[in-house]
């Protein structure tokens, strides 16, 4: 079991996939991962409780998780200038982390960070984050209703956890070629 809180684990994992992310992007990655987790797993990955802040979804608990990473030597925080603004660059250190995520959570975290890695913070917010169901119609200061993501579940009934279990089964050699299974069914039908 990890000695990091769940929220710190989420941020650290995202930094492994997207080193150099700033505060805004890091928080938005966590938010989007929680949105996808609600969609496919029916629950969040993190323990963040998002509110509509001045710059979109945010939870002040981010600072505790970030401080936990930096103070514990799991990430670096470097102050930088971005045009006229002060910003921060976060990077994972070489200190190993034992994550408490299941495979579906890992895939969601990786997917979000890789998918939005090249987005600027502005385009990430305007083109993606602000268009998510919890943000639609929300007012500044309100807690976001993350369960609205459940309304956007895959219409085909895609079950991420079952798919990953099947993939692991195939990787472990526990499968039968389709031709073999069909031939067996035909033989049973003829008998």
Which residues does each predicted region cover?
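Domain-edge interaction signal
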Residues: 1-155
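Small, basic N-terminal interaction modules of short regulatory proteins
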Residues: 140-191
């Amino acid at each position: 079991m990890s000695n990091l809180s769940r929220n710190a684990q989420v941020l650290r994992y995202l930094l492994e996939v997207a080193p150099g992310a700033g505060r805004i992007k890091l928080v938005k990655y966590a938010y989007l991962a929680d949105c996808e987790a609600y969609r496919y797993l029916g629950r969040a990955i993190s323990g963040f409780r998002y509110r509509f802040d001045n710059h979109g979804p945010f939870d002040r608990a981010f600072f505790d998780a970030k401080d936990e990473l930096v103070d514990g030597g799991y990430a670096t925080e470097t102050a930088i200038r971005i045009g006229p603004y002060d910003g921060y660059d976060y990077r994972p250190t070489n200190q190993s982390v034992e994550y408490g995520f299941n495979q579906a959570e890992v895939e969601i975290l990786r997917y979000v960070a890789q998918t939005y890695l090249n987005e600027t913070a502005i385009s990430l917010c305007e083109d993606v984050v602000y268009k998510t169901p919890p943000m639609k119609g929300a007012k500044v200061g309100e807690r976001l209703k993350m369960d609205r993501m459940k309304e956007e579940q895959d219409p085909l009934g895609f079950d991420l956890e079952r798919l990953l279990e099947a993939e692991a089964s195939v990787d472990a050699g526990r499968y039968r070629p389709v031709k073999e299974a069909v031939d067996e069914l035909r033989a049973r039908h003829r008998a």
